[in-house]
Swiss-Prot record:
Limits of the Peptidase C21 domain: 730-884
UniProt domain Alphavirus-like MT: residue ranges: 58-219
Protein name, as recorded: Non-structural replication polyprotein
Membership in a protein family: Belongs to the Tymoviridae non-structural replication polyprotein family.
E.C. designation(s): 2.1.1.-, 3.4.19.12, 3.4.22.-, 3.6.4.-
Organism of origin: Turnip yellow mosaic virus
Domain (+)RNA virus helicase ATP-binding, chain residue ranges per copy: 946-1103
Molecular function GO terms recorded: ATP binding; cysteine-type endopeptidase activity; mRNA methyltransferase activity; RNA binding; RNA-directed RNA polymerase activity
Region (Disordered): 571-739, 859-887
Domain RdRp catalytic residue range list: 1572-1678
Length: 1844
């Protein structure tokens, strides 16, 4: 802690780094070790979990794996956990040999490996099956325990008496007994079906496997007992689902504490030591609590487990808020349920949690805390709190006292009258009691009792039982009548008195109530207790305990008690009887490497000639293990495994039967289906006498047969095919194979000299050096040696001699080193020898060479040349500019739009293929050494050399790959069934102009010939068709690879890397028809993963049809064929002359060719098409044909197949071909059976692609109605904030960021259902706050012009009434002047132009109807004529030409983007008007209002421009008020189109939609030229002149984007059926319909491109305004278009063009000063200057900030008005507003003053403000809402980039 405080104190100083250096230095070794041991890229969410398990992984690995966390756990188990346990020689079971070799390198005590093939797929994992059991006393069982029953483990111990310990790894989720829900779903998931548990590691479905569902019972037992045999089971460690168990012989000794004598325990302190302890185990799970069960309900435990942190936070939240609504707990839970840490919680658990929290909110603990109280007050409080309990306790006690007299006789002193005398007479005497027969001698016993009492108390006689004090009290009471008592016996007087006298007797007499009364009292007391318990609440203590137990449950722990297991018998451990073996003698680690201790060799079968050879006899074997569907280690391949092996191994064999009765923990053994029948043993397998070492997996071809290979394997192997006929040029042998200085097989350098090399740097092929150095002369081109010598201080001679000790001479002195010099292969060898790592800085960036486990580092710079050169040291290079888009994008778009016979190409997208250097290096190395291909072996020494030889070219490419990293290239994959027509559409595509720069690569010369014939190119273009080798040496923009799967592995990567000019790759092929296999035994190409799996993600769709195969073949494959010929499937004895012959081998093919038949192998016929029936030759190799080759053979011919050869090969027996047998017998060929791992993953399409747009059904989801009370009424005037009508309030709590949706509670009930109210799924990017730095410009020089002087004489003297009109005898009112103030001139300035005020001019709208509206003759819908269709198509083609689009291409519909447009449209509709306005227009959503009806009203405005200044009456602009349904449904469509238009618009076309004046200025400066004149155009009645062609154009635009058809139909229906209050209208443009501006702009642009050949000429369009930079030639078809148009043009050739109120030119743009001058005059006279001044000032600054160049934009007549405006702002604006006239950064105080009152700031003014000011203003609440806010426009322009 003190050290951390010191570091914090040093943080701001320079002493922190030196202080941290020791810490960083200490972590280097651990990080390096972690990266080397665990090199995989682990998901970041799993890294903390692995670290909590104690696994030291750093998370910095880069290798990818489908289940990297499982590999990490497994590596830790083997290399760390098991390695420490293996202290003696041990055996390992169920592990790949390669993995075992690496494990043995970690710990040499791992001596032998035993593998058993218990499943057919185990043959891919285990090369051999061990015939015997392990021999060492310690065994490690790898990931197989879950498939074995304890009885089988007992059998293993009984069969191996020397076996003491069995370490086993078990993979089973410990929570499997709860449910199918995993506690760590990111790490693993599982499901349980019947008796099988299906385990999926890290979501890798392909790596899933099955195991018995009761495998978790291994975690519930602690011992196994069979008679006198005992095995103890110990759980050593658990890492999630992986557990390490130790099973050892015997039982553990008893706990010493249990032997302690009982006499030692004199207290309770150590009492538990005397009791036996439970064997409880627990497992790590997420921190959770268990919710209580609901009352009288049973809920699964898994649905009641919730995170403790969430529960505690929710508990506090529900009691901390002031107001809690019913939806608050659910909303709180919703915030946490989406967190990744809580993915283990079920949805039912979340539901139970929020319900539990809501229903238990009222509960509070009933406790009080009285500290400072007196004892009496505390006693009073105690009695008040506990009086019920005290009473209930006292009543039974009192009831019991009533019976005490009957069971315990206690005498009570009572006075009894014996006699009464008077007048000397005895009037009364008590009779003596009668003494009945004392049966039980009670009197005797009483006397004895009294005698005993008397003996103790002799002073108490039997009949004088009164105490002495009582006797004295009696004498005092009787003293007054003592004379009368003298005669009583008490006083010993016999004389009777005259006076009345009574004789009393005082005795101790027993008294008792009747027993019936006692029982009644007792029953009443017990009843009171019962009633108290039934009707009274629990006690305070019980309430307190229940509250805390109910609302504060403890943490849930996954634990249970382990118990012993007794088994009645054993079950065989193996399915065969193992042989006996003994342990090999122990040898030192230095003398003997780890190897298989008892690897067996299959016994060769007896010779056929031996007369005594008999078939081996078989014996019965014990039952097999419990059914293991798959083993765990086949899914989580360890780190010890090769990194290139990602395919999971096969599972062990499934056991169908079981034998009876077993313990309950493993019920599978009771099932008779679990164990298989008795299997025969394999007596022909015996152990080898001399185990070969594992470190030599390959043999020299000249050596004898591999001892690990049995002769029966050699017997079934294929014979070597005959050699091919040599080509015309001489072939040379591969130098590396025949190098006498090398020995052993050809292997990658990293395998011969294993170390941690950087990826793809040590994969070059070489051989071990066998001879010492031959002292070769040092090469002349030795710059690499010089660079290394300068860095390592080792001489060049020593470096060269060192290379001759590790590399063969053929790799040191050859044509490559003599011509191009040494390469990085030699650098890697030097780095390995001298233990350094080199960083080579090439043109493409730094690349590491040499081992990574060294500390020494050197730097080398490589320049590509020519010639290339290595130099010491590091060269600093500047960064390259980033690309602005891939050059293949136009090609891909063209492919998407290309059609052949009306069908699209069958693909969806181009996939970016990241090239693999390792794949390319592997192939080029094999080509360079002559293992694949023949180019490097061609001898061209006899011919005249005009350039580098093919081998030199290959070497150059190899060098290029060493210093250039990979790149990413688009790849389009066309895949389909044989004959589906993959080639023909591509051939037609390549004939187009855009794809003319291509080349085709084919696997065979036959296929290349077919391409040449089909393309029909000139002879000079024949170089474009190549075989796969020669294609690598050529260059083109587009590469087509036909039959990609017949190319060597890595060919795609090498083709891309070898051609820097390549932009697009098109690959054709069928993954079902097999792949390439090298014919050279030295080729390492087979080490690469299969291309079928690697290219599978690129297959967007698989064409499941055929144009080739006849109907008889199509029926076999259940596929549709367009070939109507029925075809034939039969057999022939001899081939026909014209029929092609397909053979299995090259030798047979050569034989048939020599006999005069056309023949080829089945494999080489792939891609060919035959017209005659194909003849398939059947021979002894037919049964070995793969399913892929069988498919190729059956699908070559258009007319069928005929088999020639013995019919036994198609008879369906074991010696026949299964697919050929099905075909010959007309049986269906099930593709899933022949291609089980590949065919199910193909996305089949059954017909050619006719459209690319998806089909959408439905529009809006139905919403649940809200039911209200029938007597629910609202007041007549409802305020917008009224909320008493809310039935419930459910506020949304978004997961990220604030709520962006606006409130909809105020919407009219009829409009609310029209809103989707969708939350935006895409967060818009933050608006850039950066401000462009101001550029220094010369301030403009203004001629002196006084604003007031110019304004005084600007307005001419005239009578305003002369400019008005009469409409139906009523004068208009567009020039009001009466009582209007004025100060600048003699009349109000508002008379400058007409003012449209519908409220003050009743004639405005009626008088404007005839000019603004066009009516239909009847109510019938508008009919789209043929001319409309033709003109619409012409305009659409012109519009596509403007956007460089293909008219026939379509864009797939993007539902996510459309949903965002819906949200954006609703946001604009709710924010563009105030809530009061929306409520006031509730009738717009009235259901009785037909959505085709439009209400027309006049727009209120005072428009001031050049056309209206000093003009007369002007018709108003009409607005169309449409139904809300139209706006909310079609509005998103227009915004959707706008996004794509903005993305596709060429830079030479400017659209002013959503643009600011500053953007207009920048575009003009970039694109407009100084050429004059420019063409400006405006139309007369543009909206009214659009007829049916506009509807056709708009429909075609929507169809291109694949807008749902019902929306297109709705748009057409509205346009052709619109009606108003004045009558039905034509399909004219209505201002107010969705997309008015966009559609007008597109129509205008289409007309321009129909009239002119635009080319790259800059064009500006905005609605009906347009500007062309210079005159253009007219198109030849313009007259045909013009005659159909209804437009009236207003063309103007001018040197000072006006566009959207701005004068534009190459200098920029400037606001029309005349219009601005008039607006200022009107603002002054209207006394509205304070509200409008800032807006006008910002418009003025656009041109003012241009500097002196602004004068080039204005006509001379407007210079005075520009100067007057400048004078006005200088005089009338305050200082803080004048800062807008300067480019300098404003001061903070001035900024605050400007943003203090922007209430009347207009939209244009907002656009013109600098970004800093605009951001400050928008943060203020009083800013008004614009009809189209800047945020909406920005979102529309940026949305496409975040969706696509």
């Amino acid at each position: 802690m003190a050290f951390q405080l010191a570091l914090d104190a040093l943080a701001p100083t320079t002493h922190r780094d030196p202080s941290l250096h020791p810490i960083l230095e200490s972590t280097v070794d651990s990080i390096r070790s972690s990266i080397q041991t665990y090199p995989w890229s682990i998901p970041k969410e799993l890294l903390p979990l692995l670290n909590s398990y104690g696994i030291p992984t750093s998370g910095l690995g880069t290798s990818h794996h489908p289940h990297a966390a499982h590999k990490t756990i497994e590596t830790f188990l083997l290399c760390t956990h098991w390695s420490f346990q293996a202290t003696t020689p041990s055996s390992v079971m169920f592990m790949k040999p390669s993995k075992f070799n690496k494990l043995a390198q970690v710990n040499s005590n791992f001596r032998e490996l035993k593998n058993y093939r218990l499943h057919p797929n185990d043959s891919t994992r285990y090369p051999f099956t061990s015939p015997d059991l392990p021999v060492f006393p310690t065994i490690f069982m790898h990931d197989a325990l879950m498939y074995y029953h304890p009885s089988q483990i007992m059998d293993l111990f009984l069969r191996k008496p020397n076996l003491e310990r069995l370490y086993a790894s078990l993979v089973v989720p410990p929570e499997a007994h709860l449910s199918d829900q995993s506690f760590y779903p990111k790490l693993y998931t599982y499901t349980t079906t019947r008796h099988t548990l299906h385990y999926v590691p890290e979501g890798h479905e392909a790596g899933s496997y099955n195991q018995p569902s009761d495998a978790h019972s291994w975690l519930r037992i602690n011992s196994i007992r069979l008679g006198n045999h005992h095995l103890s089971v110990t759980i050593l460690e658990s890492w999630g689902p992986v557990h390490s168990l130790l099973i050892q012989r015997g039982t553990p000794p008893p706990d010493p504490s249990l032997q302690a004598p009982p006499t030692l325990m004199t207290s309770d302190l150590f009492r538990s030591y005397q009791e036996p302890r439970l064997d409880v185990v627990s497992f790590r799970i997420p921190d959770a609590i268990e919710l209580p069960q609901a009352t009288f309900l049973q809920q699964p435990l898994r649905d009641r487990l919730v995170p403790r942190a969430v529960y505690n936070a929710l508990f506090t939240y529900t009691r901390a808020v002031r107001t809690l609504r019913t939806s608050d707990p659910a909303a709180f839970v919703r915030m946490h349920s989406s967190k990744p840490d809580h993915d283990w919680v079920t949805s039912n658990a979340w539901d139970n949690l929020q319900t539990f929290a809501l229903l238990n909110v009222p509960l509070r603990p009933n406790v009080v805390y009285h500290v400072l109280q007196s004892p009496i007050a505390s006693l009073s409080l105690y009695l008040r709190q506990h009086w019920r309990r005290l009473t209930a306790t006292a009543v039974p006690i009192l009831s019991f006292l009533t019976l005490l007299q009957r069971f315990l006789p206690l005498p009570i002193p009572l006075a009894e009258v014996k006699s009464i005398t008077a007048f000397r007479r005895e009037l009364y005497r008590k009779k003596e009691p009668h003494h009945p027969l004392d049966v039980f001698h009670l009197q005797h016993r009483v006397r004895n009792y009294h005698s005993a009492i008397s003996a103790v108390r002799p002073a108490s006689p039997p009949h004088q039982k009164l105490p002495h004090a009582l006797q004295k009290a009696a004498l005092l009471l009787l003293r007054p009548i003592s004379p009368l008592l003298t005669a009583t016996p008490f006083f010993r007087s016999e004389q009777k008195s005259m006076l009345p006298n009574a004789e009393l007797s005082w005795t101790l007499k027993r008294f008792a109530l009747p027993w019936q009364a006692s029982l009644v009292l007792l029953a009443l007391s017990e009843s009171s207790i019962l009633l108290h318990k039934l009707f009274s609440p629990p006690t305070l203590q019980a309430q307190h305990d229940t509250y805390h137990r109910h609302l504060h449950p403890g943490s849930y722990s996954l634990q249970w008690e382990r118990t012993p297991l007794s088994i009645p018998r054993t079950t065989a451990f193996l399915p065969f009887t193992p042989t006996t073996s003994t342990a090999p003698p122990d040898r030192s680690e230095a003398s003997l490497p780890p190897a298989f201790a008892s690897t067996f060799v299959p016994r060769p079968p007896p010779a056929a000639s031996s007369p005594g050879a008999q078939p081996p006899t078989t014996t019965a074997a014990p039952p097999t293990p419990i059914e293991p569907t798959q083993r765990t280690h086949q899914n989580s391949d360890l780190a010890l495994e090769s990194s290139t092996s990602t395919e999971p191994p096969p599972p062990p064999i499934r056991s169908p039967d079981m034998t009876p009765s077993a313990p309950v923990l493993f019920p599978e053994i009771n099932s008779p289906r679990r164990f298989p029948p008795q299997l025969p043993a394999t007596p022909d397998l015996e152990p080898a006498h001399t185990p070969p070492p594992l470190s030599i997996p390959h043999q020299d071809p000249t050596d004898s047969a591999d001892p690990l290979m049995g002769s029966h394997l050699l017997h079934h192997s294929l014979p070597a095919p005959p050699t091919h006929p040599l080509p015309s040029s001489q072939l040379l042998p591969a130098p590396l194979t025949n190098d006498p200085t090398a020995i052993g097989p050809v292997l990658p350098f990293e395998e011969l000299h294993p170390r941690r090399y950087p990826e793809n740097t040590a994969t070059f092929l070489t051989r071990l050096r066998s001879l010492p150095s031959n002292h070769l002369p040092q090469p002349t081109l030795n710059c690499l040696l010089s660079a290394v010598s300068d860095q390592t201080k080792v001489s060049e001679e020593h470096l060269w001699e060192s290379l001759q000790t590790i590399l063969p001479d053929s790799q040191l002195s050859n044509e490559e080193t003599n011509t191009l010099g040494l390469s990085t292969e030699h650098l890697t060898a030097l780095a390995h020898l001298y233990n350094f790592q080199a960083t080579v800085y090439s043109d493409r960036g730094p690349i590491l060479f040499g081992p990574s486990d060294t500390i020494k580092r050197i730097d080398i710079t490589h320049t590509t040349g020519p010639p290339s050169h290595f130099s010491p040291g590091k060269r600093l290079l500047g960064s390259q500019p980033s690309a602005k888009g891939h050059p293949s994008d136009p090609l891909i778009r063209a492919m998407k739009s290309f059609k052949v016979s009306g069908n699209y190409l069958p693909f969806s997208e181009a996939h970016n293929h990241p090239t693999s250097i390792s794949h390319a290096k592997n192939l080029i190395s094999n080509m360079k050494n002559g293992f694949d291909g023949v180019l490097s072996l061609l001898d061209v020494s006899t011919g005249q050399r005009t350039g580098p030889t093919p081998k030199e070219r290959i070497i150059q490419i190899d060098h290029y790959l060493d210093t250039n990293p990979g790149k990413t290239t688009p790849v389009v994959h066309f895949a389909g069934f044989a004959g589906c027509g993959k080639t023909y559409p591509i051939q037609q595509l390549l004939k187009t102009k855009l794809f003319k720069d291509f080349r085709v690569s084919c696997p065979t010369t036959e296929l290349r010939t077919e391409w040449k014939t089909a393309m029909e190119l000139h002879g000079s273009q024949s170089w474009r068709f190549n075989t796969w080798e020669s294609s690598i040496l050529k260059s083109s923009r587009i590469l087509v690879i036909d039959e990609i799967y017949k190319m060597p592995r890595g060919y795609l990567d090498l083709s891309i890397l070898a051609d820097p000019a390549l932009e697009l790759v098109i690959i054709l092929g069928d993954p079902l028809q097999g792949e390439y296999h090298s014919q050279s035994k030295d080729s390492s190409n087979h080490r690469l993963p299969s291309e079928t799996l690697r290219l599978l993600p690129y297959i967007d769709m698989y064409c499941w049809w055929s144009y080739r195969i006849p109907q008889c073949i199509a029926r076999l494959f259940q596929i549709h064929s367009f070939n109507a010929w029925q075809g034939v499937i039969g057999s022939v004895s001899t081939p026909h002359d014209q029929s092609p012959v397909l053979t299995n081998s090259h030798a047979s093919s050569l034989t048939f060719n020599s006999l005069g038949y056309r023949s080829c192998t089945i494999s080489s016929s792939q891609g060919l098409t035959f017209c005659d029936p194909a003849i398939i030759v059947l021979d002894n190799y037919t049964k070995w044909l793969s399913s892929a080759n069988g498919l190729v053979a059956l699908t070559r011919s258009r007319s069928g197949v005929q088999f020639m050869g013995p019919s036994s090969y198609v008879g369906g027996t074991n010696g026949s071909s299964a697919m050929f047998s099905d075909a010959f017998n007309n049986s269906l060929i099930i593709m899933d059976r022949y291609f089980p791992s590949l065919f199910p993953q193909l996305k089949l399409i059954t017909s050619p692609l006719t459209t690319r747009g998806p089909k959408l059904n439905g529009a809006t989801p139905s919403a649940s109605p809200t039911h209200r009370s029938p007597n629910f009424h609202l007041p007549p005037h409802i305020p917008l904030s009224y909320d008493r009508d809310f039935v419930t309030v459910n506020p949304t709590l978004p997961d990220q960021g604030p709520e962006t949706r606006l409130d909809t509670h105020f919407l009219p009930p009829s409009r609310l259902p029209l809103h989707f109210d969708l939350p935006p799924a895409i967060t818009p990017p933050p608006v850039s706050t950066s401000v462009d730095p101001p550029q220094a410009k010369a301030s403009p020089v203004y001629p002196g012009e006084f604003f007031d002087s110019l304004a005084a004489f600007f307005l001419p003297a005239h009578d305003p009434s002369t400019r008005e009109i009469l409409h139906k005898d009523q004068s208009s009112n567009q020039f009001p002047w009466f009582d209007r103030p004025f100060s600048l001139s003699c009349q109000p300035s508002s008379l400058i132009s007409a003012k449209h005020a519908p409220n003050h001019d009743p004639t405005l709208l009626p008088a404007s109807i005839n000019k603004r509206l066009r009516f239909r003759p009847s109510d019938s819908p508008h009919q789209i004529t043929a001319d409309d269709v033709v003109l619409g198509l012409q305009l659409f083609h012109s519009l596509c030409r403007a956007y460089s689009r293909q008219p026939n291409s379509t864009v797939p519909f993007n539902p996510e983007l459309f949903a965002e447009c819906i949200s954006l449209n609703e946001y604009a509709q709710l924010s563009s008007k105030t809530q009061s306005t929306i409520v006031a227009n509730a009738s717009r959503s009235d259901p009785d209002w037909r959505h085709t009806t439009v209400k027309i009203f006049a727009k209120a405005q005072h428009k001031v421009n050049d056309g209206s200044i000093f003009g007369s009456w002007k018709a108003c602009q009409t607005l169309a008020l449409m139904h809300d349904y139209v706006i909310l449904v079609l509005g998103p469509v227009k915004k959707y189109q706008r996004i794509f238009d903005n993305a596709d618009r060429p830079p030479n076309i400017y659209s002013h939609c959503g643009k600011t004046p500053n953007q207009l200025r920048d575009w003009c400066q970039e694109h407009l030229t100084h050429s004059t004149p420019k063409i400006a155009n405006d139309y007369t009645a543009f909206d009214q002149s659009q007829h049916g062609e506009s509807v056709v154009l708009e429909a075609l635009k929507m169809k291109r984007l694949n807008i749902p058809s019902h929306l297109i139909q709705l748009h057409v229906h509205l346009k052709t059926n619109v009606s108003t209050q004045f009558g039905p209208l034509t399909c004219m443009r209505l201002t107010g319909e969705p997309g008015t501006y966009d559609d007008n702009t597109d129509y205008n642009l289409a007309v321009i491109y129909s009239q002119y050949d635009v080319g790259s000429c800059p064009i500006m369009v905005s609605g009906d305004d347009s500007l062309i930079d210079h005159p253009l030639p007219t198109r030849h078809d313009w007259p045909s278009v013009l005659k159909r148009l209804h437009l009236r043009f207003k063309l103007e050739l001018t040197s000072h063009p006006l566009f959207c109120g701005y004068y534009v030119g190459p200098a920029g743009c400037i606001r029309n000063p005349l219009a601005l001058f008039c607006k200022l005059m009107i603002a002054v006279d209207d006394d509205a200057l304070d509200d409008r001044r800032l807006s006008y000032l910002t418009e003025f600054t656009t041109g003012h900030l241009l500097g002196e160049s602004l004068w080039h934009l204005l006509p001379e007549t407007h210079v005075q008005y520009q100067s007057a405006c400048f004078d006005f702002f200088c005089r009338r604006c305050p200082r803080h507003e004048k800062m807008l006239l300067d480019d300098s950064t404003p001061a903070l105080s001035l900024l605050e003053r400007i943003t203090s009152s922007p209430r009347w700031l207009t939209k244009n003014a907002m656009y013109l403000l600098p970004a800093k000011l605009r951001l400050a203003i928008t943060s203020l609440s009083q800013t008004q809402s614009f009809p189209e806010s800047i945020e909406v426009s920005h979102a529309e322009s940026e949305l496409l980039h975040y969706v696509q």
